[in-house]
Amino acid sequence: MLALGKLLELTLTAHEPAEKTQVTPGGARLRWLGEGALEVRPAESEDCGLDLLLSAGIHGNETAPIELLERLLHGVANGKIKPRARVLFLFGNPAAIRKGERFIEQDINRLFNGRHELSSGFEALRAAELEQFARVFFSKPGRNRLHYDLHTAIRGSKIEQFALYPYKEGRKHSRRELARLAAAGMEAVLLQSKSSITFSAFTYEQLEAEAFTLELGKARPFGQNEQVNLDKLEERLIRIIEATEPENESSLDGLQLFSVSREIIKHSDSFHLHLPADIENFSELSKGYLLAEDLAEMRWVVEEEGARIIFPNPKVKNGLRAGILIVPDSGQRLG
């Protein structure tokens, strides 16, 4: 296997390879771009016109997606996977990956779309670097652009594998992309309705990629991910890389759609979230339930039918989102 296929090993040891470019027997070119960043370019005659960005390790303790990217890269490097798409593999937060921690100083997935310019420290610098990797990768005109940012979570979930689809005014969410997600094993998709500061929101809003945050199960240490079943996703990613997907895929069978009803914003240290600490994502909340309270008698009461909560976190910094209230979506606005 080509040495550059061992990107995870290089990242874990903070090692810079002596040889920055290698070529597979099939003509695919592997190029090391910087720490945790490697581009795969197919032979020119095989190029299908897709640029695929696969990122993992934005949070350093979310290891199952990192291991998945490592398997895919090994497959390319040993010739078992024959790429027809350009692929950029990114390990988002190398320092946190080495420590097995979510982050070093602050959550890097709250520092995109310009937020890093308002901050300082290691993660702010890395967020700017990741944006630049993506900006250069997606700079070629006339090509299809797709970004999957892969995550796992400490919190349990009623729906284990789901995607978040970013928002941009005037742009419709794609039914074709949702069908692709359904085929990849996603059980639900949250259709977002406002701009965000995550990595996938940056590539969707600023770089015109189809982009998604994929939540894939529980976060566990390296080598302990047997219960995180990524078989369908891995199979689909190989088909995307090799350009062997079915044509005109449109079935959304088994895929639940949700939209954001409200975001719960923590305004002060007096904020209190009235939920059990171990509540699972997608837990249903009854109408009339007092969800949260803050200063000046600010109250969040559930008014929506079929409401569910995701990403509840009362420990976030003031001014940030402490939870999202979501409701079922009919999908009538899909493009």
Curated annotation (Swiss-Prot):
Provide the reaction this enzyme catalyses.
Answer: N-succinyl-L-glutamate + H2O = L-glutamate + succinate
Tell me which residues bind Zn(2+).
Answer: H59, E62, H151
Q: Which UniProt keywords apply?
A: Arginine metabolism, Hydrolase, Metal-binding, Zinc
Molecular function per GO: hydrolase activity, acting on ester bonds; succinylglutamate desuccinylase activity; zinc ion binding
Pathway-wise, it operates in: Amino-acid degradation; L-arginine degradation via AST pathway; L-glutamate and succinate from L-arginine: step 5/5
> Is Hydrolase among this UniProt entry's keywords?
yes
Active site annotated at which positions?
A: E215
Which of the seven top EC classes does this enzyme belong to? Answer: hydrolase
Q: Does the keyword Transmembrane helix apply?
A: no
Pfam families in the cross-refs: AstE_AspA_cat, AstE_AspA_hybrid
| EC identifiers of the protein | 3.5.1.96
The UniProt note on the cofactor reads as follows: Binds 1 zinc ion per subunit.
What cofactor does its activity depend on?
A: Zn(2+)
**Domain of life per record:** Bacteria
- Could you state one GO biological process linked to this protein? arginine catabolic process to glutamate
Q: What does this protein do?
A: Transforms N(2)-succinylglutamate into succinate and glutamate.
Please state which protein family the record places this protein in.
Belongs to the AspA/AstE family. Succinylglutamate desuccinylase subfamily.
Under which name does UniProt file this protein?
Answer: Succinylglutamate desuccinylase
Organism this protein belongs to? Pseudomonas putida (strain ATCC 700007 / DSM 6899 / JCM 31910 / BCRC 17059 / LMG 24140 / F1)
